[in-house]
A protein has these predicted regions:
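Short beta-strand segments
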Residues: 109, 143, 151-153, 199-203, ...
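Short acidic, glycine/serine/threonine-rich loops at helix termini
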Residues: 92, 110, 117-122, 153-154, ...
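Glycine/serine-rich anion-binding loops at beta->alpha junctions
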Residues: 77-100, 104-117
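Alpha-helix C-terminal capping segments
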Residues: 47-48, 94-107, 187-192, 227-228, ...
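Phosphate/diphosphate-binding glycine-rich loops and adjacent basic-rich segments that engage nucleotide
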Residues: 144-193
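A glycine-rich helix N-cap at a beta->alpha junction
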Residues: 123-149, 219-225, 229
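Acidic, glycine/proline-rich low-complexity segments that act as flexible tails and inter-domain linkers
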Residues: 1-88, 305-309, 420, 424-425
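Well-ordered secondary-structure scaffolds
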Residues: 5, 10, 15-18, 28, ...
C-alpha cells in the first residue's frame, strides 16, 4: 500500500477501500504519511466526497487509532454536546455546568479555534490558571466531583483526528462534510459518552452555508452515533448572525458568566436552555428545569467549582486588549443584517484565532457588538468595538467587516430568523 495510490483513487472520484482507509489513517498517525500528502487527500475528499460506507470506515479507523474511554463507574448518566462551529458560539461554557446542575455528568472534550470560528479551549484558557490538558485520572476526578469537565482530548483519544484537525484548519479543507462528520464522531464515540446532542450551525458564519448541507451533515453524524450505540440527536441552528454580543476569547467568557448569573443576551440563553433540555432528555433525566437552575444560582455554582477544579480562578480579572477601535453606524434606521462570517474573520484577524496551527491567540482580542439585527440605530452611535493588542491589525479586520451589515430606513419591517431551524433524530 502506498499513499500516492490512495490519493489518486479519491482524486479520480473512486471509492476508497476499507484497506486503503485503515492503512492511510494508521500511516498518517505514525508519521509515515506526511502532512503535505494528507493535505492532498483531504482536498480530494473535499472536492469529490465520500459515500456512507467510506465515512463509517474512516470514522472507525480514527477511533481505532487510539484508546476508548468508559464512564460506567459514574453514578449519573453522561450527556455531551458538540457544535460544528460558529461565531460567538460560547454555548458550551454555560451549558456544561447547567446540565451538570440538573443531574447529568458532562464529559465535554473540546477543541481549538478552527478557521473563522472560536475554540472552547482557547476561550477558557483566558481564565488565569485554567488547564485544558488533564490526565484521564484528573478528568474523571473533576467529572465525579463537579459533574462537568471541559478539557482537551488526550493524546491517546483518536490521535489521527488530532493531527488531521489541525491540518484541515490551515489547508482550506475544514468544510469537507465527510471530514467534519468523522472528526466529530470519532472523538465523541471514543470518548464513551452515553448520549450526544449535536448543534449543527447553518448560515454565513457556519461551515455549512445552506440548510441542505447542514441536514446531510446532521443525518450522517446521527447515523454514525446511533450505529455505535450512542443516543444521538441534532439541532440545526442559525448562524447567519453572531451568537450573543461578543466574538473573542475573554470577551465570550465574560458573556458566559453573565448567562450563568441569570442575565446575558436572549439568543444565548434560549439556545443554552434548548440544548440543555435535549441533553437531559437524551440522558433519561426527567422533570429537570434548566431555566430554574440558571435563575437559582446552581448552574453558576457548578461553573465555579468546575473552573477551580481545573486550576482556574473563577474570580480573577479576565484579560483586556490594550487597544480598541469603535465602528459607528453610518446612517440612522434599522439594522437588518449583521454578517456572522465577517465578524468571525474580523475577530480572527484581530488575534482571536490562528493563521497557522502553532500560532498563539490573543486572549483579549475580538469584537464586541452594540446592536443586533432588528435594533434601531442612530447615525454615529457605536455598532461594534474592535479589541486587539496589535493596533496595526485594525485595518485588516475592518476590511473583513466592510459590507457586512445593512441599515434600512426607520420603520422598515424586520422578521428575525428563528434560532432553531430543525431537529434530526
Amino acid at each position: 500500500m502506498d499513499v500516492i495510490s490512495v490519493i489518486r483513487t479519491k482524486r479520480d472520484r473512486g471509492e476508497l477501500s476499507p484497506e486503503q482507509i485503515d492503512w492511510v489513517i494508521d500511516a498518517y498517525t505514525r508519521g509515515v504519511v506526511a502532512d503535505e500528502q494528507m493535505s492532498a487527500l483531504a482536498m480530494a475528499i473535499l472536492l469529490n466526497g465520500m459515500n456512507r460506507t467510506e465515512i463509517a470506515r474512516w470514522t472507525a479507523a480514527m477511533i481505532a487509532s487510539g484508546e476508548r474511554m468508559n464512564f460506567d463507574s459514574l453514578s449519573r448518566p453522561t450527556a455531551d454536546k458538540h457544535s460544528t462551529g460558529g461565531v460567538g458560539d460560547k454555548i458550551t461554557l454555560p451549558l456544561a455546568p447547567l446540565v451538570a446542575a440538573c443531574g447529568a455528568a458532562v464529559p465535554q472534550l473540546s477543541g481549538r479555534g478552527l478557521g473563522h470560528t472560536g475554540g472552547t479551549l482557547d476561550k477558557l484558557e483566558s481564565i488565569p490558571g485554567w488547564r485544558a490538558l488533564l490526565s484521564n485520572e484528573e478528568m474523571m476526578h473533576v467529572l465525579d466531583t463537579t459533574g462537568a469537565v471541559i478539557c482537551a482530548a488526550g493524546d491517546g483519544l483518536a490521535p489521527a483526528d488530532k493531527k488531521l484537525y489541525a491540518l484541515r484548519d490551515v489547508t482550506g479543507t475544514v468544510e469537507a462534510i465527510p471530514l467534519i462528520a468523522s472528526s466529530i464522531m470519532s472523538k465523541k464515540i471514543a470518548e464513551g459518552t452515553g448520549s450526544l446532542v449535536l448543534d449543527v450551525k447553518v448560515g454565513t458564519g457556519a461551515f455549512m452555508k445552506n440548510i441542505e448541507d447542514a441536514r446531510e451533515l446532521a443525518r450522517t453524524m446521527v447515523g454514525l452515533g446511533t450505529d455505535s450505540g450512542v443516543k444521538t440527536v441534532a439541532l440545526l441552528t442559525d448562524m447567519s448572525t453572531p451568537l450573543g454580543l461578543t466574538a473573542g476569547n475573554a470577551l465570550e467568557v465574560r458573556e458566559s458568566v453573565e448567562v450563568l448569573a441569570g442575565g446575558g443576551p436572549a439568543d444565548v440563553v434560549e439556545l443554552t436552555i434548548a440544548l440543555a433540555q435535549e441533553m437531559l432528555e437524551a440522558a433519561g433525566i426527567k422533570d429537570a428545569d434548566p431555566a430554574k437552575a440558571l435563575a437559582d444560582g446552581s448552574a453558576m455554582d457548578h461553573w465555579r467549582r468546575m473552573i477551580a477544579a481545573q486550576g482556574g480562578d473563577p474570580d480573577a480579572a479576565l484579560p483586556v486588549a490594550r487597544e480598541q477601535h469603535v465602528v459607528t453606524a453610518p446612517a440612522s434606521g434599522v439594522l437588518t443584517r449583521l454578517d456572522a462570517y465577517g465578524v468571525g474573520v474580523g475577530a480572527w484577524r484581530l488575534g482571536a484565532g490562528r493563521a497557522r496551527k502553532e500560532d498563539p491567540v490573543q486572549a483579549g482580542a475580538g469584537i464586541e457588538l452594540h446592536a443586533k439585527p432588528g435594533d434601531t440605530v442612530t447615525a454615529g452611535q457605536p455598532l461594534m468595538t474592535l479589541h486587539t493588542d496589535t493596533p496595526e491589525k485594525f485595518e485588516y479586520a475592518l476590511a473583513a467587516l466592510e459590507g457586512g451589515y445593512d441599515i434600512a430606513p426607520a420603520g422598515t419591517a424586520f422578521s428575525a430568523t428563528p434560532i432553531i431551524l430543525d431537529r434530526i433524530a
